[in-house]
């Protein structure tokens, strides 16, 4: 699937599954291999909980703690944009993709009920309901065991 990013259309493909199914491991392996092949890859990770990317005592943390609604930290080698949502609804995947720069592919971790094409990741020691079969956007299952046929 292609979505509109800052520089035009970008390919989007997801990796979905329940907690501890191996999503991050698969994403990291895919990013490593695709970048080795010369692709420019971005990722978006969905978190079900609050998180911080800066740390107590750092200037950016102090800016946010003082009430800044948005903070950008920039250096010669990278920049990060932190937006406090407060009472705003969570950002949609399409909205976040709109912030992505020129890339060959964006891999999305999470958003297991989105409309973008995805792989489902399953692990034998992390049993969970199957997503595939109930969601046409799931194109394949990656698992450490053979999967029984659905009845």
What kind of feature is each model-predicted range?
Residues 8-10, 37-39, 67-69, 101-103, ...:
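Short coil/turn connectors at secondary-structure junctions
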